[in-house]
């Protein structure tokens, strides 16, 4: 699961939500992120400290080594190839899904197996939260995962001040 470079709380929050879905469905998954260059150090520290969450993160280079022809790359919070955390990883994986809430750019990620694009959503975290409502039980979501999703929504809505709707 990979967001954009200089990950913010929405990119990380939505990735953590999808990681929850993968955990519940017993599918191995990790978040591709640059642990030094991001805008969410405190959330990363909380996630690393949470029980059972020690091995959530992987570098783009390590993900390139681990990926094979059965891998699915889920890109969150961007639809532009030049903005992803690790472009070589994007280019090396044939099965890619994109979940984002931004307007479609002229240079978007093509040839995807799934494109969940909802420009009226407040955030990618909101979209993932909606997916979780239909795919996991409420008790399956860890408190730190719920916190990550809420952090992403709070960031992109400027504390629920803009771009909110009945779904938010």
Where are the model-predicted features located?
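A structured phosphate/pyrophosphate-recognition subdomain
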Residues: 1-7, 14-27, 103-168
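Anionic-ligand anchoring segments at beta-strand to alpha-helix junctions in alpha/beta enzyme folds, i.e.
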Residues: 1-69
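Hydrophobic "anchor" residues on beta-strands that sit immediately upstream
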Residues: 4, 30, 73, 96, ...
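A glycine- and small-aliphatic-rich helix-loop capping segment at beta-alpha/alpha-beta transitions
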Residues: 19-21, 49-53, 90-96, 134, ...
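A generic "cationic amphipathic patch" detector
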Residues: 31, 42, 86-87, 141
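Sparse, context-dependent recognition of short Cys/His-centered cofactor- or disulfide-binding micro-motifs
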Residues: 32, 58-59, 74-75, 81, ...
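Short, well-ordered secondary-structure micro-motifs
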Residues: 42-43, 86, 109, 161
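Active-site cofactor/cluster-binding pocket
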Residues: 53-114
């Amino acid at each position: 699961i990979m967001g954009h470079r200089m990950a913010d709380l929405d990119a990380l929050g939505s990735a953590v939500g999808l990681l929850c879905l993968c955990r519940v469905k017993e599918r191995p998954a990790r978040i591709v992120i640059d642990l030094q260059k991001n805008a969410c150090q405190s959330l990363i520290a909380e996630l690393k400290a949470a029980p059972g969450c020690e091995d959530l993160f992987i570098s783009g280079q390590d993900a390139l080594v681990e990926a094979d022809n059965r891998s699915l790359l889920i890109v969150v919070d961007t639809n532009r190839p030049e903005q992803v955390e690790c472009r070589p990883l994007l280019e090396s994986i044939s099965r890619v899904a994109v979940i984002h809430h931004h307007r479609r750019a002229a240079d978007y990620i093509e040839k995807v197996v799934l494109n969940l694009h909802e420009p009226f959503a407040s955030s990618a975290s909101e979209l993932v939260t909606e997916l979780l409502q239909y795919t996991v039980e409420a008790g399956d979501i860890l408190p730190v995962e719920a916190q990550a999703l809420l952090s992403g929504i709070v960031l992109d809505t400027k504390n629920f001040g803009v771009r909110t709707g009945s779904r938010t």
